[in-house]
Amino acid sequence: MDAVSLQLILGRASGLRYGQLRSALESISSRPIDIFAVEALLGKRSDTLQSLGLGPAASAWLQAPDAATLAADRYWIARNRIQLLDAFDPRYPPLLTHVRDAPALLYVRGDIESLSLPQLAIVGSRAATLQARLTAMQFAAELSHHGLTITSGLALGIDAAGHEGALRAGGRTVAVLGSGLDRIYPAQHGLLAARIAARGAIISEFPRGTVPLRNHFPQRNRLMSGLSLGTLVVEAADKSGSLITAQFALDQGREVFAIPGSIHNPLTRGCHALIRSGAKLVESTRDIIEEIANSLPKQDDMSRNSSPKRVTRRLATLDKGHKILLDALGFDPTSVDALVERTGFPSESVASMLLILELQGTVGSEAGGRYVRLPDERPG
């Protein structure tokens, strides 16, 4: 049987973990443990497979894989350029090999090599405030300039802002799904997902046709933290799913960072709880870089105390919308709400444009979520 067929069989073995699989193979196979060793499990009685430590669902499937389902899966991966990454492959993310319940197979759309680059997970509330989304975008952009790939879950709010910040800064980003790669969730992020695949990867441990069920998201979260050197929580209520990701990170021996907020905002209580429990309080990207600097790629003229490089462009290169926003901003500190009122632009558009202008060095941010236009640089 060829490698792709065996990989597709693994992908349909519900709940199968790499550790379980390897242990079972070592019990019955004398050949080297690789993807081809999996064939030794096929057709064995379900109770025999369970006695080797595999779960009931995985055992039942391995006893009698459905040929029609596998044929449809093979057609799907070929048509949609889906890559299969089994845990025996040397390209399997090295940090995931240290996660106790790492999946036996990942479905990947995009660049597999992105999964082995240094990553930082950015997570937070789906119903995040505009200021928190701006913060997530800014942190993602600046961390990208330090060589970090930004990993998140494609959800509304902070997840999307983290992906967007990395993309707008020309960086890499990875989205981990709680569904099959054919079921982008939420559906409105279809275009964002395509952009992520072009600048990184979208991955899932779930096979084609898997819908985004509630219990899938903790599984997704443990992959996000498992791929990453650390997890940054930008804004989270006291029962946010982001806290699950943070707990996975702690259990996996990874760093946890949290951005504090107003004591009057219920969406910051989760971050404050993390800080009280030992997470590092973060006020700038420098606070993160100094903790993980030894794991980052070396870059010329960059030290752990340096500020992220900014993309500097002349005002003449800005489009009409950005110029309107700059004119509305002026040189006095101004809130996002005021800019929305002055320009008539949607708040999301203002947020995105402010991020670009800040990366270009034409806008600066101040305390309280206010922005100010910076003097245009002139030669000499």
Protein language model regions, located:
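Short, small/acidic-rich helices and loops at N termini and domain boundaries
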Residues: 1-91, 336, 360-380
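Glycine-biased, small-residue-rich flexible motifs in mid-sequence functional cores and linkers
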Residues: 1-4, 15, 80, 84-380
